[in-house]
Amino acid sequence: MTVIQGVIMSNSLSKTTAYVQVIQNDQQAINAAYQVADFALEGRNTRDQQRLLPHEQIESFSQKGLGGIRIAKKYGGAFVSNKTLAQDFRILSKGDANVGQIPQNQISLLNLIEIMGTEQQKQFIFSEILAGKRLANGGPERNTHDSKTLKTTLTIENGKYFLNGEKFYSTGTSFAHWLAIKAIHPEGHVVLVIVNRDAQGIEVINDWNGFGQRTTASGTVKLNQVEVNPELIFDERLLTQVPTYRGAYSQLLQVAIDVGIAEAAFEDTLSTIHKARPIIDANVEKASFEHYTLQEVGKLNILLDAAILLLDEAAEYLDELDQLQTVTDEQVAKASILVAEAKVYANDAALQISEKLLELGGSRSSLSQHNLDQHWRNARVHTLHDPVRWKLHAIGNYYLNGHFPARHAWI
């Protein structure tokens, strides 16, 4: 038994984990995503309207083996392609955008651990995930200068490490076994700390009240003198020592979620139009025969197809980079720009299609029992994370001035 296992096993959660499937290839990952998405679609409206958290659906995500699909094969993962990863999150988000968003932090965090972690750290964390445990992000902090500014601190007292602070936008923490917390080290640099969700001094509060993505539980995490295992402290300075495309990788998941929302809205648009009555002046038998409606549906379909194609193109480029031992600054910049281009179209597709759904569906589409507004609410809230106005700025600056975008999780 290693030191890290010995220390942590004494603090392991008492919760037992059900049998977890082992995904071995891309097709199995896609099949599993469809199964979870079908389950997530059941009761989606009720959960959204009553703010009921999708505990069973997220547990299904873990049991199907989806939590570790990008873990390297040498650690027992399938290491599926980025294209498959994006498709999986499209599928999940079409079923329920909340179920798509909740585990995306885990996928991104595992990538950071792959970059920063020692072999011992990676073996432990990856084995936990493959066993069905979940990792969530203690999110950014409120009332700071910007989303990167931290007040949470890691202190050393009598040779022991402690966390103190408060986080918000902590998507997935209500479902997690482990939390990833960013804090300021006593020496002044930023560290990522992994702590047990049930550790003394941690309080997870489901106070998220956004009008969209209502059941992501993206609320508060309070940290009061939480003792930290020094074996699970990661120095974020390691992220900048060599070029990495971690930002593009993280953003790829956000794009996939937006595309999934757009696909769900488009499907409901077609269904709703078929049930709608035609406008009097149209002089047609069905609303689906209206000339202007046909034109709008055509535009929406093109927009959605473009978003999907750009997402696939960006994912395929990341797959090319995965085959390289090292990447250059130029390749990292291109990755961020390709994902940013996909993000712009995914943003527009999710918002425009979900809005047109209500317009083309007519007055009945506004009735609360249909809950058709959920797609627009989800799209509007999720697209606020990383506004496309800055994506467009980065894209223009790249092509016009040869300026490389910043390196962080938002580009």
Give the residues covered by each predicted segment.
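Generic structural signal for well-ordered, non-transmembrane alpha-helical segments
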Residues: 34, 260-263, 298-305, 340, ...
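Glycine-rich beta->alpha junctions and the first turn(s) of the following alpha-helix
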Residues: 210-305
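A glycine-biased, small/acidic residue-tolerant capping/turn segment at secondary-structure junctions
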Residues: 319-327, 351-376
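Glycine-rich phosphate/cofactor-binding loops in nucleotide/flavin-utilizing enzymes
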Residues: 361-411
